[in-house]
Amino acid sequence: MKLGINTLLFLFMVTVESFGANPTWSTSIANIIYSNCSSCHRYGGIAPFSLMNYDEVVAKKNSVLEAVTTRSMPPYPADTKFRSYSHQRNLSDSDINAFVEWVNNGAPAGDLASAPNPPTFSSGPIIKNPNFTAEMPFYASQAKAGGEDEYRCFVLDGSPTKDEFISAIEVIPGNPEIVHHVLVFQDTSSIPLQLDAQTSEPGYPGFGGVGSNTAELIGVYAPGGEPYFFPKGFGLRFRKGARIIVQVHYPAGTEGQMDFTSVRFNYSDAVSPREVFIDPLLNHQNIVNKPFRIPAGQEKTFTQRMTIPIDATAFAVMPHMHLIGKSTKIILRMPNNDTIPIINIPHWDFHWQMAYTFKTLQKVPKGSILESTVIYDNTSENPHNPSSPPKEVRVGEGTTDEMMLTYFYYCQYQSGDELITTEVQDDSPIDMPLTDITFMQIQDGVIVKFPGQIAVHSLRIYDVLGGIVHDQQSNHRHQHSSLTIPISISGTYFMHAIDADGKQYTGRFSIMR
């Protein structure tokens, strides 16, 4: 394979910059912090201190060092070596090693004049002209310092007059400093209103759910999260007459602080939107080793299996357990007995629940089997156990009860679904049409051809499972009209690149050996 001199120089600089010794704030640490920490660690964010500039990070460098080396921060419970996901917030081994080396070397600043600018965060909603909006009433958190977190459900005003299809959903925390996470449901029954009427304050308590068997999960918010955009042409049914219920998590120590969280929806403009469903396909009915009981003082492992009755397409996965959940691992067993990783959460944290979106849509063939292995720890050694001493635990929505559910976002499969990427959302500034980028296979890889000279800031290649097979970053402004990427394994791949001006480029290609 012949490489142009510019390409060789570019790859050399990327290698030196990414893996060279003596990282500084300006060359690498700032990008790591801004990309993974600052969305929460900023003034007005939910984190307890800001990490928005060199001085702030140096002042907290030891705390940050402990958090990143123990992988307690950023909070992203899924094992991304098992499978990677869109918009994931976790540090690579090289990121962690760079931060450790930076601290050990005295946290050098480098050339601050060349350091990247801090990120800017919108103070308002991203969905500017929603088709539907609803707000909860003003509410003062009752979560006392040193006490328990509060989980409260609110029934929001407003309902659609006919069935609509939601193409985008945004949760806007009224007080980002106290809203830990939000689950969004719709319900056509009157049960949530009845529960709401039983309390004098706005809303009603709800730890494990919203108290209605007919409520349907439609959205999730966690700190630093962005609106959820379904790929074009897809939508989630918003039922005529349905009310929106939000379950809001307020951490202990927020007592007396006010919140007024709201939600915004955009509706699909497709003539016939493809309907997306969110259902707990793995649930208490398909537990293999029933009954679902966890004896006091024991760890217990359960397995679920579900045979898929149709060809389906999966967008995202969201496991759900309560406080004695320890771990969950899910695979897809194909009809030919091959296995595909879906999700692995080795250390379950009830307080950090989220939906994990596949980087490319996952085909789930008819006859394949979803299979989970879930462990519960009902011992006194579990610091999250709500009962002391431990008591037998069964299914239920209460604090001392448990659940074993995994929600999937899915639809009926159509040919080509597995080529649809979710890495770039509909509101992202995709400046170059897909046809403007071409790919040419060569003996040892592929040549990516851009329509003109661009300064590549970052370029990643993903496989069909969302795994990163090539990653290069650069702070230099060297211009390229093409880049050569070494890839030796046959398959379909997806490219996402960003130039020095923030323009984004996407494309897909196949390698045949």
List the predicted regions and their residue ranges:
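Bacterial Sec-dependent N-terminal signal peptides
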Residues: 1-24, 483
